[in-house]
Amino acid sequence: MLFRSGLEERISTRVGDLRTDKFGGGYDLVLISAICHMLSEEENRNLLARVYRALVKGGRVAIQDFLLRADKTGPRAGALFSLNMLVNTQGGASYSEYEYTAWLREAGFGEVRRVPLAGPAGVLIAARG
């Protein structure tokens, strides 16, 4: 997709273990897409802290995933998917916008903004101050 869009010179990707690898630094944007639901709360906190350290000042993280309401009973697709994660992963679940926002703030990020998407998922964007 990067080659088709002509962005291969502007976007870099890396292979690694998101649970343990150090990401280095100097990034303007880190995209975490359909990942956080596979991780426990502790693993997500650790991931976001490492992402924060990898970003330049003003750099952003974008998290795309199911975003549950605070009571975690919906939207329906995200709540049902959370059951799947609870059964099939060691600690994964769908998380609420409130939980993500708390983790992002704990890691040091500033304002958190939600971008609605068509369908059951959403995007949260936060900047490193």
Q: Where would I find each of the regions flagged by the language model?
A:
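Alpha-helical subdomain
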Residues: M1-G129
